[in-house]
Amino acid sequence: NLLEEETKMKKNSLQELGWALGVMLLPVLYAVWVYETLPENLSIHFDLSGKGNAFLPKFLVVSAFPIVMMLLEVMIYWTTIAKDILNRTFKHLIRWIFPFTFVSLYLATIYRGLNEEFDIRKTAAMVVALVFIIVGNYLPKKVQADRELINRKWAYLFVLLGFITFIVSIFYL
């Protein structure tokens, strides 16, 4: 019975991985659709003023970059299967935060290639703020069998930094 339950959990994990990879493919379809209108080189890194300071050919951004990100997602899934995570909600959060972060930042990168006036800093800051808030929410909880609880003050600090970053990104960027 324990073997059946473990097999079912792995099957569910593989289905969830398939959904996550599918979500990660959606912005790639958009990038393929607008491929001809993209500039030859796309910014993949930006300085604090929002200007691109590292570039890749659009072919690599549209094709190779998503493949690398999907491989990282597979590694995240493998890690959450191999390592015993006690909190199921946290396990799903770890599995889905990367695809949604990728989708947000990838779409922002593609849109920035189409519109130089688009301020990518706002999108990046909002994603970082949400990650801080989520991590702060789960820091004080015991999520792995072999780990100790982390002091709640760190969790409060992460949540506070997340809210401040989010407010700054909305009103000041």
What are the functions of these language-model segments?
Residues 10-42, 47-49, 55-173:
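Feature 926 captures the class I aminoacyl-tRNA synthetase adenylation module centered on the KMSKS loop
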Residues 1-8:
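Short, Lys/Arg-enriched N-terminal segments with co-localized hydrophobic residues
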